[in-house]
Amino acid sequence: MRRAWALVALVAAGLAVLTLLAAAAADLLDGHPAARVVLVLANAGSVWAGQAVLAGWLVRRPWAAALAGPLVGLLSLVTYYVLGALTGLTPWSGLADNLGWLVAAALAGVPLGLVGALARRRDGLGALARLVVPAGVVLEPLARGWLGHGELGGGPRGVAGLVLVVAGLAGGALVVRRRIVTSR
């Protein structure tokens, strides 16, 4: 169980550092389109929600998953803003200015962590839980309008949206294929 919690902390730190590096690269490269695409992907809500599902999956048990989901989100946010402030990439007030994200991580993390624990099941409910992240990854760019209004042709959000849709469809296909193969 300790190893699982260490992995949860590693996931949190990893996403925080990735997002911070993406922001730094976008600034350093004067908003280069490729750097902006990576930044949009790193900041995608479905990616941050996905880490809560992964945390729940890592710790396995429902009670632990209900703790791991919010913990990974909160730890990622705090790590992002503290490292950002220490490196001068974000202001020290960043954490206080974004209390809404902390509340969202705490509240949404509980059910998302539980989805992760459910995803370990080998029945239909487990398969359904494993489809939550791919579905969210597909739906986010559609719901946020990233694929409309001419952005698809070259705008960073359009490209990131397309990447998310393709990744989500591929992830969903893997879940469905695995479910079909294991049910034989």
Language-model features, listed with the residues they occupy:
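Membrane interfacial helix motifs at helix-loop boundaries and amphipathic/re-entrant anchors
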Residues: 20-47, 78-104, 124, 138-163
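Internal alpha-helical transmembrane segments of multi-pass membrane proteins
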Residues: 61, 65-70, 117-138
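Alpha-helical transmembrane segments in multipass membrane proteins, preferentially the mid-helix core
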Residues: 106-126, 140-146, 170-176
